[in-house]
Amino acid sequence: MAACGEPGRPWQEEEAAAVVVVGSCMTDLVSLTSRLPKTGETIHGHEFFIGFGGKGANQCVQAARLGAKAAIVCKVGNDSFGNDYIENLKQNHISTEFTYQTRDAATGTASIIVNNEGQNIIVIVAGANLFLNSEDLKKAASVISRAKVMICQLEISPAASLEALTMARRSGVKTLFNPAPAMADLDPQFYTLSSIFCCNESEAEILTGHAVSDPTTAGKAAMILLERGCQVVVITLGASGCVILSQAEPVPKHIPTEAVKAVDTTGAGDSFVGALAFYLAYYPNLSLEEMLKRSNFIAAVSVQATGTQSSYPYKKDLPLALF
């Protein structure tokens, strides 16, 4: 595996990316309102903005802002949103060598409504993301095989995510799988191909059929997921932190986080995943528990500002103790 140097050092395109994401790019269309509308109701919002999102790109951007050499394998439309997105990735120092454009679909979009408490409802139209295919992945095999960590989600086709995970595992690359948006009938291979299986409470509910509302119920859901073949299961619980369970230590452990005033929780889970990937790649000797504590902290910073990627902190904005 190619050496990846020090986090945060400017890097050349020929250097191997330590964190590789195979996933989605979405243009966020965000409306801020005092409260969320009811069915059939029209309400006034007080602000609108267009931002950059998509679980894959979000996770990649957070890892890059912490100092990771990062690359993304994704597909956007051959349109203004797609062109703007490629420029956004470059500005975040993310390799776009395998960022493809297609004329067959528009760049993916996410329509987001956020209330005064920072709660949100989201509708995504995946668009070009679903056109990322096996041929695209094969072209990107060199960057996937040389990574230290590869992240996948489910905003691209499940078949593409499964193929990417298979490629990574075959090359000895650590895999971090975020099963979002969750599917009740998830292919069993996703569990066995994931070095770390990381989901939130609502995703854990869909996957297991059991209610998840606190660390205790999260631990029970994690046990079910572990029994399906995962090596490590992490269930995030928002303001309550997260729960971890592993084959090596099959007793659920709750890792709390600091209480903060949330302004906008959109993308907080992606901030957590991106931070975790950064620590897995650059601080492999840290305990997983410590990595999760630090990832909790970074995600908590992100909820204190509006927007998705716009809320993600840079290394320079964070305490030195995290590095």
UniProtKB/Swiss-Prot annotation:
The gene is Rbks. Pathway: Carbohydrate metabolism; D-ribose degradation; D-ribose 5-phosphate from beta-D-ribopyranose: step 2/2. Activated by a monovalent cation that binds near, but not in, the active site. The most likely occupant of the site in vivo is potassium. Ion binding induces a conformational change that may alter substrate affinity. Competitively inhibited by phosphonoacetic acid, etidronate, 2-carboxethylphosphonic acid, N-(phosphonomethyl)glycine, N-(phosphonomethyl)iminodiacetic acid and clodronate. Requires a divalent cation, most likely magnesium in vivo, as an electrophilic catalyst to aid phosphoryl group transfer. It is the chelate of the metal and the nucleotide that is the actual substrate. It comes from Mus musculus (Mouse). This is Ribokinase. Its main location: cytoplasm. Signal peptide: none annotated. Its cofactor is Mg(2+). The keyword Hydrolase does not apply.
